[in-house]
Amino acid sequence: MGKPKSTPVKTQKSISSFFTPKSSQKPQNSSPPPASNAPENLYDAQSDQETNETAEITGNSSKRTLEEDANGGNTGATERPSKRAKNVDVEEEDGEGSSLPAANARKAPSSSMLGKSKPSTRTNKYMFSGLSQSVAAEPTIEEELEEESEKARKADLHRKFVKKLGHPDSIKRSIPEDDAALEGDEDMEDEEEAPAPVKTKKKGAKTGKLTPMELQVLDIKRKHMDTLLIVEVGYKFKFFGEDARTAAKVLSIVCIPGKFRFDEQAHLNYFASASIPVHRLPIHAKRLVAAGHKIGIVRQTETAALKKAGDNRNTPFVRKLTNVYTKGTYIDDIEGLDSTDAPSGGAPATGYLLCITETKAKGWGTDEKVEVGILAVQPATGDFIYDNFEDGFMRSEIETRLLHIAPCEFLIVGELTKATEKLVQHLSGSTTNVFGDRIRVERVEKPKTMAAESYSRVAQFYADKLKAHQSSNNAREQELLEKVLRLTEPVTICLSAMITHMTEYGLEHVFDLTKYFQSFSARSHMLLNGNTLTSLEIYTNQTDHTEKGSLFWTLDKTQTRFGQRLLRKWVGRPLLDKQRLEERVAAVEELKDNVNTPKVDKLNATLREVRSDLERSLLRIYYGKCTRPELLTVLQTMQRIANEFAHVKIPSDAGFDSVLLNEAVASLPEIGGVVISFLEKINAQAARKDDKYAFFLEEYETEEIGEHKCGIGAVEQDLEAHRKEAASKLSKKTPVTYVTIAGIEYLIEVPNSDLKKVPASWAKISGTKSNSRFHTPEVIKFLRERDQHKESLSSACDTAFLAFLAEISTHYALIRDTISQLATLDCLLSLAAVASLPGYCKPTFTSTTEISVVGGRHPMVEQLLPSTYIPNDTSLSTDPDNTRALLITGPNMGGKSSYVRQVALISILAQIGSHVPAESARLGLLDGIYTRMGAYDSLFTAQSTFMVELSETASILKSASPRSLVILDELGRGTSTHDGVAIAEAVLDWVVRETKCLCLFITHYQTLASVARGFEKGKELRNVHMRFTAERNGKQVSNANADKDGEDVNEEITFLYEVGEGVAHRSYGLNVARLARVPKAVLDTAASKSRELEAEVKQKKLLGLSKMISNVLENDVDQLEQLIIGMEQL
């Protein structure tokens, strides 16, 4: 007989971790666990009060059966032993013996993981405990007095371990660390030593001596080569082969050496592996998908008790790929649902998956044209954005849509053109891109018959949905089907590809929600292209691409996640509909004026009480992935909101003057009746504890649930009746009393003095010096029946819960509309909070295109500056008698760019519906804002700085309309002065004469000031400059006389940041060089060269003027005007 193995005793009333979700139970009658985790057979003697004894194995004993089950039923194969570094028990590698005493004696998850309080008595009755059927291997140390022999045996084993592990220090890794640290630190995981080589020879050498479980994993991996598999093995999730190396790098966990590929490293008999605890799966899955990996969860699809009762008890546990996730499809992030705080750092994540396809390029060079189709879906909220458009060689249209949508994942159908491919790589290829994180890119082929196949697949998909939902809404669903079938060919191709793609992740149901399809190109919003979003810092700042300092950051005072998402849409798509805009502005004004009134306080209080992301939770309900506590939170939150406004029967009952506010508030109580009907069916206390067995009230439980509960009750009655029969066999008059030790129930304790009365058919489970504990054959049989009922009950509870979620999903549209109205109220209250800031005013809107602002300020800089921001006035209008363009000059760092951004941002704020930072604002509705600011090259399109500058300018000239605002900053600086001036003057003249839009033109070319004289009325273009003061040798120098003696390096420049009439005759570049601490010797040389060049230029101008004078004297009147202009410039 081999040497006994020590199995630690761990008190555990029941193992609820067989079910998902779990509930916690406190241990009872626990024996203390061992103080350390010594290697196999290296154990210390137990205490004198409780010494484990060797289990007696009889022909009728269940111990052999359980041991066979511990090996996954693989009687013909030898399993490798594994030595864990942080567990106190010895478990078989396959981890499939769910009912093993060794497995059940493991350290159970803490109560903080499984629930904050004990389940109800009703639930305890149905909790499955695999321990109850186990025969714990707790052998007694028979040779306790032979200390010398024991020491020699330990020393021999130690030498073997040293030889096996390579060096003595390696064994330190098997010492368990503090369990509290394991619970508290996400990076400390269950680690394993490399398994010892199997000494016995196995059959099937051609399979590389892999275990049946590893062969299962290998088979799944072959079918999903692009997926990182996370495999459930007992109480852990494990990674194998190359997946283990990848996971170890991302998660900072230990990778146990072994073969990384099946077809390589033939000298190794086992795969490399890494493992994580079961309760840490959501955290690590989120980290893996955030790193850009596609992960698959492989779960055991059968449980120990049902497997033992079935015909396949001698085969490994069946494992299947149950879930696949990527960054865009990971909707199981429960942590993110309970917080209203935005993620810190990085760009705001939208969670969109974007599918893109395009036709082959037509034309060549700058005449290249491509037709593009996009479809973006947000699985977490059910929103869709689609578009079909033509784009030029700069791909500015694609860039605009990508920056607006900010996808977290791309699906590319077919091949993209070279320019588009480079754009996608540029925007997503690094961790420092404008989206704030690395973007995952997947590709699918595009055969020549893709269009026809896509129409067929989409039509079939929605036709099947229509058949499956024959109801009163049949007409509405038919209308949605027709809407989908009217989509253009490129969009249909994207839709078909996306349906196929989402089906792999089990999220194809999101395409039922075609009500929320939205076209990006719908001209009901102001167009903000990609350059404008970046230049004006709409979503992120230009310094570190974070949200702080952006326009969205300035306006975001929302209290809910879904309100924050809606506000982001509002910021990127300012309104063009004057009626809707005035309704929104009026609502904000009313909320601002009534900020401390009871009705507004009630709205704020209601939003503050929303602790979860209702919009995402609703989609999880729709997908059938919602947890019981999450469902309870959603239903109770919706009930609380409905009760708060139960008195509102019609919109006028809300008590507001604003139609928008009244309609939003009136929609909130509509959901009350539906929510209450669902809450009446569930047990709130059980739902809060994630208790599946008591979730439904008894009258609403399904027949199957009741049947299995009755079965469990009958078995427990049989166990109670068996007490008398057991007592009679022990010659006792009173019924025996069952005891529970280390989580093993229904033990019969017999004093060692009465062991001769115990029948041989009784299986000894454990014992002490004074007592022994047994299971009778009848108890083993009853417990097996009870466990089968419990596992069937667990499955029935899960099935009933999914049916309950499906029933709630039938009211998806009503609940979604209520949440949307709640988000609208959140956004309006956020804008009202901004309007309450000092110095903000309500804008008024006109039918003409104009911008008339008094005392305007930059909304973001004002909040970031510690000092007061200097306000400025602006007056632009497309009326013939007014100025529609400003030519802005001034010294470097004088505030020119901040001023033009301020004008644009005030226009955007007004059309969002917000108050604006100004004393007064009278604005027309702009259909677009176009900017050309900054200097940068474009390596991904192989374009120089000047090429990018002119390409963007050309795009603006083609796109701008008389209702647009165009901002051009230092156009022409990327080339020589003469060419730059020529291009800048031509563009300025075209914008003012031909396009006739509002324009702000910044330049350092003072000669452009003469363009204003070329207009008949002299008002269309006006020269302004950023005011400043200059002191030279203690004397103030006026702007008019600033350039008489050239620039002096010792001049002190004071920026006034005010807009004044006229032209600034100098840019004071040397002043900026001095502020930048350029060496004084360099500054002196630069000042000298500057004076020389200016003198040379003046000399040339004088020479030219002298020639003109001679021509004028010869009666050449045509040159008289040129003469006058030249003299003014001098």
Curated annotation (Swiss-Prot):
One of its GO terms (biological process) is mismatch repair. InterPro entries: DNA_mismatch_repair_MutS-lik_N (IPR007695), DNA_mismatch_repair_MutS/MSH (IPR017261), DNA_mismatch_repair_MutS_C (IPR000432), DNA_mismatch_repair_MutS_clamp (IPR007861), DNA_mismatch_repair_MutS_core (IPR007696), DNA_mismatch_repair_MutS_N (IPR016151), DNA_mismatch_repair_MutS_sf (IPR036187), DNA_mmatch_repair_MutS_con_dom (IPR007860). Belongs to the DNA mismatch repair MutS family. MSH3 subfamily. Residues 1-152, 168-207 are annotated as: Disordered. The keyword tRNA processing does not apply. Residues 207-328 are annotated as: Mispair-binding domain. PANTHER family: DNA MISMATCH REPAIR PROTEIN MSH3 (PTHR11361:SF122), DNA MISMATCH REPAIR PROTEIN MUTS FAMILY MEMBER (PTHR11361). NCBIfam families: PRK05399.1. Residues 140-149, 177-194 have a biased composition (Acidic residues). Component of the post-replicative DNA mismatch repair system (MMR). Heterodimerizes with msh2 to form MutS beta, which binds to DNA mismatches thereby initiating DNA repair. Msh3 provides substrate-binding and substrate specificity to the complex. When bound, the MutS beta heterodimer bends the DNA helix and shields approximately 20 base pairs. Acts mainly to repair insertion-deletion loops (IDLs) from 2 to 13 nucleotides in size, but can also repair base-base and single insertion-deletion mismatches that occur during replication. The gene is msh3. Its main location: nucleus. It comes from the Eukaryota. One of its GO terms (molecular function) is ATP binding. Residues 8-20, 44-63, 109-135 have a biased composition (Polar residues). This is DNA mismatch repair protein msh3. Residues 80-89 have a biased composition (Basic and acidic residues). Heterodimer consisting of msh2-msh3 (MutS beta). Forms a ternary complex with MutL alpha (mlh1-pms1). ATP binds at residues 890-897. Signal peptide: none annotated. Pfam families: MutS_I (PF01624), MutS_II (PF05188), MutS_III (PF05192), MutS_IV (PF05190), MutS_V (PF00488). It is found in: Nucleus. GO terms for cellular component: nucleus. Keywords: ATP-binding, DNA damage, DNA repair, DNA-binding, Nucleotide-binding, Nucleus.
